Design a protein with these regions (language model features):
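N-terminal topogenic membrane-targeting module
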Residues: 26-115
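Long, charge-dense partner-interaction scaffolds in eukaryotic RNA-expression machinery
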Residues: 252, 281-283, 320, 346-354, ...
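Amphipathic alpha-helical scaffolding segments comprising HEAT/armadillo-like alpha-solenoid repeats
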Residues: 63-68, 100-114, 136-149, 170-181, ...
Length: 373
């Protein structure tokens, strides 16, 4: 009897799930139909305004009032997004002028969305950020809303708010937002920040200057994030990175970020320090040796090769791997390293054979592909 009861309960649950899925399909389909209908209405009126802008006219007051009333509903905001997604590429300059004219509309509806649930509230800055609706001096009301969202526990709210801040091109707002995140209690992945900074709509040089001015006011974690941003954006800060890298009072993570910077951008003055960090007998943490061994791929020289060859016999696999990769990038051939490959150090011999095996496989694949080109 117990088994039969369990089976009946299981069948009841399965039936309920199937019914739920069927109902959901119908509900979502009906919602899509409604959104499509609203989108068509938006598209007609928006295209009329775009035509007026092309003729040198401004967006009509009636249209602004209509959009103010319509965009207070989430379904209409979704429909608006679909319309703009379709027409944005048609005439970007005219569309940009139209979107900027909607700034007053978004000021009015911002307070409405701030009082909605976190998903709806997060969608508002998403639209602002996606279409670059804000100017460099955005309305205070919207800025205030964005900074409120930066303190929300939802990562969607915080990330979308940051994306909207980046589109303003205002360095003051970006730095202020970064400080809010830095002092907040919510986790914010560093890659989201560094990638977001790369999408900053203003002058990158102005933003970088401002970040360096405020650099010491940030926590260690945020400093590392900013250093990563500099690594991805500019090779003009070798002197600053060298000073930080050689400053023993700095946190290790900051110095690691500096070593990675010199692994991306050649800076002659950093070569001697990198050789020192790549020496596994320097008394420092192993991470220095691991990262510096990879960075030395940009610094050909007798001392570099000597240090990397020595590292091939290290017990740490990452040190061996990075050293072998750097030697390969420096142009070392099988014959150049034959003494190690055929030597008694099994660690060094195996990692080099591994590297050359990989290279041979890649070369064979290229040869097979070349006749078909």
């Amino acid at each position: 009897m117990k088994i039969e009861l369990i089976i009946y309960v299981y069948l009841f649950i399965c039936t309920g799930m199937i019914a739920f899925n069927i109902i959901s399909v119908f509900v979502y389909h009906r919602r899509d139909i409604k959104t499509t209908r609203i989108s068509r209405g938006f598209e007609e009126t928006i295209k009329t305004e775009l035509s007026n802008i092309k003729n040198g006219e401004s967006v009509s007051e009636n249209h602004l009032n209509y959009m103010t009333a319509a965009l207070q509903r989430e379904a209409n905001m979704i429909a608006f997004n679909k319309v703009m997604d379709r027409i944005c590429e048609a005439d970007s300059q005219t569309v940009k002028a139209y979107l900027i004219s909607l700034e007053s509309v978004f000021v009015t509806v911002s307070e409405k969305y701030l009082r909605k649930d976190e998903i709806a509230a997060a969608y508002f800055p998403y639209i602002i950020g996606r279409y670059g609706i804000l100017s460099e001096e955005p309305p205070e009301q919207i800025v205030r809303m964005l900074f409120v969202l930066l303190d929300q526990p939802s990562i969607y709210s915080r990330e979308n708010a940051m994306q909207a801040v980046y589109t303003t091109g205002n360095t003051e707002y970006v730095v202020k937002a970064l400080k809010n995140i830095d002092r907040g209690n919510h986790f914010y992945h560093s890659k989201l920040i560094s990638d977001g900074l790369l999408r900053f709509k203003g002058e990158a040089a102005a933003l970088q200057k401002k970040l360096w001015e405020e650099f010491e006011t940030f926590s260690t974690e945020m400093k590392v994030t900013l250093l990563n941003y500099f690594r991805f954006s500019s090779g003009e800060y070798g002197d600053r990175f060298l000073t930080l890298m050689n400053d023993e009072s700095q946190d290790d993570e900051i110095r690691f970020a500096c070593i990675r910077y010199f692994g991306k951008y050649f800076y002659k003055e950093a070569e001697q320090a990198l050789v020192f960090y790549a020496d596994c007998d320097n008394g420092l943490r192993e991470e220095y040796c691991i990262i510096a061994s990879m960075a030395l791929a940009l610094y050909p020289g007798e001392q570099t090769v000597k240090t990397l060859k020595k590292n091939l016999g290290n017990r740490n696999w990452y040190i061996r791997y990075n050293s072998s990769a750097s030697l390969e990038k420096l142009g070392m051939t099988y014959l150049d390293l034959i003494d190690i490959i055929e030597g008694n150090d099994r660690y060094a011999s195996e990692i080099l054979r591994y590297r050359f095996d990989i290279r041979n496989v890649i070369e064979e694949e290229r040869e097979e592909e070349s006749p078909n080109e």
